[in-house]
Structures are given as structure tokens and as C-alpha cells.
A protein has these predicted regions:
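Conserved thiamine diphosphate
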Residues: 1-8, 81-84, 110, 120-142, ...
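Glycine-rich phosphate/diphosphate-binding loops that line cofactor/substrate pockets in enzymes
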Residues: 34-50, 69, 110-113, 221-230, ...
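Active-site diphosphate/adenylate-binding microenvironment
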Residues: 192-280
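Thiamine diphosphate
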Residues: 107, 112, 150-161, 165-169, ...
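Glycine-rich, acidic loop regions that bind phosphate or pyrophosphate groups
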Residues: 26, 83-191
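Glycine-rich beta-alpha junction loops
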Residues: 1-7, 54-56, 147, 236-240
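Conformationally flexible catalytic loops at phosphate/diphosphate-handling active centers
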Residues: 1-44, 202-205
């Protein structure tokens, strides 16, 4: 224990001469053999799905690099709560968010997939539910900068440790070369199947009998009125899930939300920080009453 007077008293801090983090090393370039193995598995897949996570944002993977990989593979993709802005919401291969608050198409595609390519996500319980029932027919390719995340929840058939900014373009090159040499499986029937599910079960809401506005409708109108460079921020709760489904993202780094920790009260100070960092861009906070009351004194 540290005594209260020691906790509250002034002290002097001196930076150590070297910042040493024992037990952790930044990964080098991705393993070429693993990349080749991943390209082989993807090219043989008849029902592949790309599972895109927030690590793509944190690694600052260029949009053009990610778009090239997605369109080269041509598979439908899902985006986790922290990755909603890594690819345009209106991209024809985008199935939306997976998991317990996800779209029917995203959940259904993962459950039917024969290969899941996970880029910067962690197979958390809000996506998988019970891990032993998640995508049971799929081989898993898992890419992460942290080796401790790989095979932690779901065993990876092809583990790749590396910075996604390096892995994404390298995998594009490897996949293109493999297909040129050996061809690939036909995924047109799979894309058609997923497209039919998406068309049959769109995201929507039911109008109220008394004609009052639904929250989803309010968010939709706000989205239509906002400019493309708007930064969207939310608190945690139902309004967060409505925002995830009804906002349209067209560029990266336009979405701030508390996901894994799920911290109520996050929204207002985060929105103020976003505006301080980007004073020339509009910033909208969509918040709940409970979240707002937790930190409204920040104003």
C-alpha cells in the first residue's frame, strides 16, 4: 500500500535514460512462408470472408492498400465496431458489423464461411458468442501485431504476426502471384448467396403507431445532413448500436467509440478532444442520457 500523504504529495519525476520494455519486441517483416500459405488457403476457398478489425485503423493502413486487398480477393467483408470506418459503408462487398448487435448478412456469412481472414481483430465475445459455435466450418487466417492475441480465442490455422501496414500490401502481392500461377476457386455463387441474404434482411426500423420519430430515423437524417469529413463520436449503449448501423462512413478515422471497455461517459470528452485536434472538421456526439450525465461537467 502507498500512504495517502504520499499519493497526494508533490514529488519529482526524472525520465529514465532508456525506455526499456522487457518481454516485448516489435515484430519484423511478416513471415513470407506464412503469407504464401495464406494466399494458397484463400485462393482455394469457395466461401471466404474478410473479418476487419480496429487494428487496421491503429496501424494506419492506407485506404488504397486495404481496398486493393479486399477487391483483389473479392470476398465479402465484415467490420467490427471499431473498424466501421476502415472501408466505405457503401462498398458493395461490405456486410456491416458482425456479432450480437450485427447484421443478418454479416453473422450469416461468418457462420457459413469456409475461410475467415481476420485482420486486426481479436475474436471477442460480442462477435463470436460461444467460440466453439463460431464459424465452425472455417479455416482461420489471423493477422495481428501482438502474438499473444493469435489463437487466444480461436486457433489460427495460418498465424501471421506483423504490422498490418506491412502485411496488407504483402498479402496482396502474394495472392496476386499465386492466382496468376495456379488460379483460384470460383466465389461467384458465394457472393450471390450473401447478396441475397443482405437484400432479404436489410437493416431497418418500424415506424411508431403515434407517428413519433424513432431514434434510428433521427440518426439517418443527421447522417444525410453531415459532410463526408464529419467525425462521429458516441457513448455506450443502445444509441451506440443505432449509430453503428445507421451512420455512413466514407473515409477512415471518422469514428470514435468505446468498444471493448464499453466506458459510459466516454463520448463527450472524446468529442471535445476530437474538435481540439481537428478544429476545422465538424464533430458530432450521439449520446445517451446516462452517458451524458456522467461527464457533462466537462463542458
Amino acid at each position: 500500500d502507498i500512504s495517502k500523504d504520499a499519493q497526494e504529495g508533490p514529488t519529482e519525476f526524472v525520465w529514465p535514460p532508456a525506455r526499456d520494455l522487457p518481454g516485448y519486441r516489435l515484430p519484423g517483416k511478416p513471415n513470407q512462408r506464412r503469407l504464401a500459405q495464406a494466399a494458397e488457403v484463400i485462393s482455394a476457398a469457395e466461401r471466404p470472408v474478410l473479418y476487419l478489425g480496429g487494428g487496421l485503423n491503429r496501424a494506419q493502413v492506407p485506404t488504397e492498400d486495404l481496398t486493393e486487398l479486399v477487391e483483389l480477393i473479392g470476398a465479402p467483408f465484415v467490420t467490427t465496431l471499431t473498424a466501421l470506418d476502415v472501408m466505405p459503408s457503401e462498398h458493395p462487398l461490405n456486410l456491416g458489423m458482425p456479432g450480437m448487435h450485427g447484421t443478418v448478412a454479416a453473422v450469416g456469412a461468418l457462420q457459413r464461411a469456409d475461410v475467415v481472414v481476420c485482420l486486426g481483430a481479436r475474436f471477442d465475445d460480442r462477435v463470436t458468442g460461444r467460440p466453439d459455435t463460431f464459424a465452425t466450418k472455417a479455416s482461420v487466417i489471423h493477422v495481428d501485431v501482438d502474438p499473444a492475441e493469435i489463437s487466444k480465442i480461436r486457433t489460427a490455422d495460418v498465424p501471421i504476426v506483423g504490422d498490418l501496414a506491412d502485411v496488407v500490401p504483402a498479402l496482396s502481392t502474394e495472392f496476386r502471384d499465386h492466382v496468376a500461377a495456379d488460379g483460384r476457386a470460383d466465389i461467384a455463387p458465394w457472393r450471390g448467396e450473401v447478396g441475397r441474404i443482405q437484400a432479404t434482411y436489410p437493416t431497418g426500423w418500424t415506424d411508431t403507431d403515434d407517428g413519433l420519430l424513432q431514434p434510428q430515423e433521427v440518426i439517418t437524417h443527421l447522417d444525410r445532413a453531415a459532410s463526408e469529413d464529419t467525425i462521429w463520436v458516441t457513448g455506450v449503449g443502445q444509441h451506440q448500436m443505432w449509430s453503428a448501423h445507421y451512420l455512413t462512413f466514407r473515409r477512415p478515422h471518422t469514428w470514435l467509440t468505446s468498444a471493448g471497455a464499453g466506458t459510459m461517459g466516454y463520448g463527450l470528452p472524446a468529442a471535445m478532444g476530437a474538435k481540439e485536434a481537428c478544429p476545422d472538421r465538424p464533430v458530432w456526439l450521439i449520446d445517451g442520457d446516462g452517458c451524458f450525465q456522467m461527464t457533462n461537467q466537462e463542458l
